[in-house]
Amino acid sequence: MMKVLVVVALLVTLISYSSSEGIDDLEADELLSLTANEQTRKECIPKHHECTSNKHGCCRGNFFKYKCQCTTVVTQDGEQTERCFCGTPPHHKAAELVVGFGKKILG
């Protein structure tokens, strides 16, 4: 009976050690993934910044990704140029307002 307990204890120790090694590998992979996501986040264009040259590079807001919103600007010379900025579309603003109000009510 004592031999069985010793063997079971050894097996449990080996299994826990091997699973902890696997977890360490997973944590290293997650750390690399998080670093890559952070790098991507740094490269995105923040809210209210110009996105004329990169219309799909806006960052994420609280709930939605910001959209590149463009307007045509007419200079004093009569030249028309397109200027774009990252912002929250009106329907996203409304959805965020409803969600924020719901959170306040539900606590």
Curated annotation (Swiss-Prot):
Cystine pairs: 44-59, 51-68, 58-86, 70-84
Source taxon at top rank: Eukaryota
Tissue expression from the record: Expressed by the venom gland.
Subcellular location: Secreted
A GO cellular component entry from the record: extracellular region
Alphabetized PROSITE patterns for the sequence: SPIDER_CSTX
Keywords for the protein's UniProt record, in alphabetical order: Disulfide bond, Knottin, Secreted, Signal, Toxin
Propeptide: 21-41
Molecular function terms, GO-annotated: toxin activity
One Pfam family named in its UniProt record: Toxin_35
Region forming the signal peptide: 1-20
Record remark: domains: The presence of a 'disulfide through disulfide knot' structurally defines this protein as a knottin.
Family from the record: Belongs to the neurotoxin 19 (CSTX) family. 04 (U1-Lctx) subfamily.
Stated name of the protein: U1-lycotoxin-Ls1v
Organism encoding this protein: Lycosa singoriensis (Wolf spider)
